[in-house]
């Protein structure tokens, strides 16, 4: 399996799960993923695991998984990509975090004008220890992903 620095050709599936999405995972099969790996021969595949909405598209143990999930697609992607020797990376929305901001308004980033940003989280609060680090450990430990791309921090950081 190629390391990221050895990779050139990759695929990014930019699905940001929301709580109103229905039947997540219902139609994805191992054969679908295997066909992608065998026909396109990517060095890596990157899929979404937590989008800007703050909901995960896999059954996270940390309480922010979308409610209508029919299949653990992350396990499916990991199983097949391991068998096909393709690295698997995650898309993870970092400071752009609508769900956590809504549930913990005191943790929102403070802007230049003294007001809190509606959807951007501060990194010197509880978020890093309560969600970010535990979720990254969950992805590395339970799913054995090859890496994570943290999205939003350069253009959503306040």
Q: What are the residue ranges of the model-derived segments?
A:
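The substrate-binding groove and active-site-proximal loops of carbohydrate-active enzymes
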Residues: 12-28, 56-72, 114-133
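Alpha-helical packing segments of well-folded alpha/beta enzyme cores
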Residues: 32-36, 40, 73, 77, ...
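Active-site-adjacent "subsite" loops/lids of carbohydrate-active enzymes
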Residues: 90-145, 152, 157-158
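Hydrophobic beta-strand scaffold residues
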Residues: 81, 85-88, 92
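N-terminal structural segment of carbohydrate-active enzymes
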Residues: 1-52, 86
